[in-house]
């Protein structure tokens, strides 16, 4: 069950990455798509929720391919952004890894509503973008 849910999430992330929008916007959309879809899957699926938190090693094993695909997706968007002058990144592989693991670390607080408590997505997006753009060396235009 977890594998099929991760496949749906992966497909959705691929759709976001293929959009004809600026790389800086893609990164923010990828972050929010990842978190909202993980939450949706866990909330929708009671036994998956229990399994998700009880047997983390099994989940990590199932997630391995998804995680690798997501990191690769970040690499592609960061490369695109660097080539377009949107990002000032010295090591794309490292930044893609860091991005993936930061988002992964936010999953549980996001699922439980502990991230940006009381804020809507519309309220939090500009703040998240500011943090992300700062890390990517984004120059404001």
Where are these regions (language model features)?
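A glycine-rich, basic-preceded beta-loop-alpha segment at the flavin cofactor/substrate interface
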Residues: 1
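Hydrophobic/aromatic-rich alpha-helical bundle segments in the mid-to-C-terminal region
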Residues: 46-53, 60, 82-129, 139-141
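Short secondary-structure transition hinges
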Residues: 29, 35-75, 83
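Hydrophobic alpha-helical connector segments
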Residues: 4, 11-40, 95-99, 125
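Residue-level signal for short amphipathic helical patches enriched in basic/charged
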Residues: 4, 69, 90
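Hydrophobic recognition helices of helix-based DNA-binding modules
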Residues: 5, 9, 13, 38, ...
């Amino acid at each position: 069950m977890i594998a099929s849910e991760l496949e749906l999430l992966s497909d959705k992330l691929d759709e976001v990455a293929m959009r004809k929008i600026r790389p800086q916007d893609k990164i923010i959309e990828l972050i929010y798509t990842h978190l909202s879809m993980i939450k949706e899957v866990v909330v929708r699926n009671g036994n998956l929720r229990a399994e998700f938190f009880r047997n983390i090693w099994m989940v990590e094993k199932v997630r391995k391919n998804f995680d690798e695909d997501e990191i690769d997706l970040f690499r592609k968007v960061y490369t695109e952004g660097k080539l377009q002058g949107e990002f000032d990144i010295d090591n794309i592989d490292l930044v893609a890894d860091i991005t993936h693991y930061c988002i992964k670390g936010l999953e549980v607080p996001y699922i439980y509503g502990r991230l940006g408590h009381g804020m809507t997505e519309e309220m939090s997006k500009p703040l998240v973008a500011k943090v992300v753009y700062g890390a990517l060396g984004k120059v404001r235009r």
